[in-house]
UniProtKB/Swiss-Prot annotation:
Domain TRUD: 150-371
Name listed for the protein in its UniProt record: Probable tRNA pseudouridine synthase D
Gene giving rise to this polypeptide: truD
EC number(s) given by UniProt: 5.4.99.27
NCBIfam families xref list: tRNA_TruD_broad
Statement: the UniProt record of this protein carries the keyword tRNA processing: yes
Length: 406
C-alpha cells in the first residue's frame, strides 16, 4: 500500500532497517505547560513493547480503577520505548508506588487538567536505522528536500494496522454500508503469523460464528464482542455498533488517511508544488512551527503572491483533503485532483454523513509537508541515529521512508 506512493526526492535511498529492537525507536511526548494547572494527578509513563491502550488497561486493573478514568493525550508505537503522560483524577499515588508491571514504569510529575486525545504539541524522536547501505547520500537527500520544502506528510502504516493492514478496507466497506463484507475483513483477514490467524482463516472459509467463538483467542475481545452481538441480533451492522466509538472511528479515519495519501502522491506525480500554493488551494495557518489545521483560507488569483510570501516565512502551509461531509473543498487544479481521488474510489463526501452517528466524520485539512524541527543525525559504521521533533499527528516513519526509500 505505502510502497505505491511517490517519493518527493529523486536521490536514491540509504536503505536500512528500523525497529529491529524497541530501543531503536524512542518517542518522548511533549505537552503544553498549561496542562499543569488543575487537581488531577499527572504521571509520566515509560513503556516498552506495549500498546498505549493495553498498558493503560493493565495499570487501571492493578490499581483498582476503570481504565476510562485514566486520561492520555496520544497513542504511541508498540514496538518502541515511549514516554507519555497520563492523568488520574483521584489519589492513587500509594497504589502506583507499589505497581510492578513488566516494561511499564510510572513517575508522578505533578497536578494538572485531565488529559484528552490531542492535548499534546508533538513528539520528540530518537531513531536508530541499522544495516544502512549508503549513508553518504543523507546530505544530498536532506538538501533536495530542503529545496522542496520538507518531507511528504503521508500517514504511516500504523494508521492502517501494522500487523494487519485492513483498517482502511473495513472503513470503505462501512462507508458503503456493506457491513457483512466489512465484518469478513475485520474478523477473517489473517495477520502475518499472528496468534489467532488460523481461527480467522477458518471463519473466512466457513462463516461459522459459533465455531469462531470457540476458536478466537480471548485477547481478541473486540472481535469476540462482535461475534456475540451478531449471534444475538443476526445483524452485522448491530455487531459493529457494539464496538467502542474510538474503535469505530479508527476504521473511518484509516480510509480518510488512505485517500489523503493518494491525493498527496498524485500531486507529486503531476509535478504540482507542495511548498507553494496555486489558485484553488486551501492553506492552513502555522504558529510557532505548529500547523493550525482548523484555521484555513482559500488561495485565489488575487491573493496567491501574498499567500506564498506567508508560506516562505513559515506562517502557512499548503494542505490536502481529509474527506468528510463538511470538509473545505479545494478549487481549480487541486479541486480536480480531489474529485478524481473520490471518483476513482467510488465514494462521495455525503457518505460520511450517512454513517451511523458514532462513525460520522466531518473531515478537514492536513498539511502536505512535514517540517521536522531540531533535525540531526549521527553516522556510526552501518548505523545512523536520527533525532527530530514532529507536531502531533505526523509520522516519524514517513520521514524515514523518504530517507531510506522503503
Amino acid at each position: 500500500m505505502l510502497e505505491e506512493l511517490k517519493y518527493l526526492s529523486e536521490t536514491p535511498g540509504i536503505g536500512g532497517r528500523i525497529k529491529v529492537k524497541p530501543e531503536d525507536f524512542i518517542v518522548r511526548e511533549i505537552i503544553p505547560k498549561s496542562i499543569f494547572k488543575g487537581n488531577c494527578q499527572i504521571y509520566l509513563m515509560k513503556k516498552r513493547n506495549w500498546e498505549t491502550i493495553a498498558a493503560i488497561k493493565e495499570i487501571a486493573k492493578r490499581i483498582g480503577i476503570h481504565y476510562s478514568e485514566i486520561g492520555f493525550a496520544g497513542t504511541k508505537d508498540r514496538h518502541a520505548v515511549t514516554y507519555q503522560y497520563i492523568s488520574v483524577c483521584r489519589d492513587v499515588r500509594k497504589e502506583v508506588e507499589k505497581l510492578k508491571i513488566r516494561d511499564v514504569e510510572l513517575k508522578f510529575v505533578g497536578y494538572g487538567r485531565p488529559l484528552k486525545l490531542g492535548f499534546l504539541l508533538g513528539n520528540f524522536f530518537l531513531i536508530r536505522v541499522r544495516d544502512v547501505k549508503r549513508p553518504e547520500l543523507i546530505p544530498k537527500i536532506i538538501e533536495e528536500l530542503k529545496i522542496k520544502g520538507g518531507f511528504p506528510n503521508y500517514f504511516g502504516i500504523q494508521r492502517f494496522g501494522e500487523k494487519r493492514s485492513v483498517n482502511h478496507i473495513v472503513g470503505k466497506l462501512l462507508l458503503e454500508g456493506k457491513y457483512e463484507e466489512a465484518a469478513e475483513v475485520f474478523l477473517g483477514y489473517p495477520g502475518n503469523g499472528m496468534e489467532g490467524d488460523e481461527a480467522r482463516k477458518r471463519f473466512l472459509e466457513t462463516k461459522d460464528v459459533d465455531l469462531a467463538l470457540e476458536e478466537f483467542p480471548k485477547f481478541l475481545r473486540y472481535e469476540r464482542a462482535m461475534l456475540y452481538r451478531y449471534r444475538e441480533t443476526r445483524s452485522w451492522k448491530k455487531a459493529f455498533l457494539v464496538l467502542p466509538r474510538p474503535i469505530l472511528r479508527i476504521f473511518i479515519h484509516a480510509f480518510q488517511a488512505y485517500l489523503f495519501n493518494l491525493y498527496l502522491s498524485r500531486r507529486i506525480e503531476e509535478g504540482l508544488p507542495l511548498n507553494e500554493a496555486i489558485p484553488g488551494d486551501i492553506v492552513v495557518q502555522v504558529k510557532r512551527g505548529i500547523p493550525l489545521r482548523t484555521r484555513t483560507y482559500r488561495v485565489t488569483e488575487t491573493n496567491v503572491d501574498f499567500v506564498n510570501e506567508k508560506i516562505k516565512r513559515g506562517e502557512a502551509m499548503v494542505s490536502g483533503p481529509i474527506f468528510g461531509y463538511s470538509y473545505r473543498k479545494a478549487h481549480g487544479i487541486p479541486g480536480r485532483l480531489e474529485e478524481e481521488i473520490l471518483d476513482e474510489n467510488e465514494v462521495n463526501v455525503e457518505m460520511f454523513k450517512k454513517l451511523p452517528k458514532p462513525m460520522r466524520e466531518p473531515g478537514g485539512r492536513r498539511e502536505l509537508l512535514i517540517k521536522p524541527r531540531k533535525f540531526a543525525y549521527k553516522r556510526k559504521e552501518e548505523e545512523v541515529l536520527f533525532k527530530f521533533f514532529l507536531p502531533k499527528g505526523v509520522y516519524a516513519t514517513s520521514v524515514l521512508r523518504e530517507i531510506t526509500k522503503h
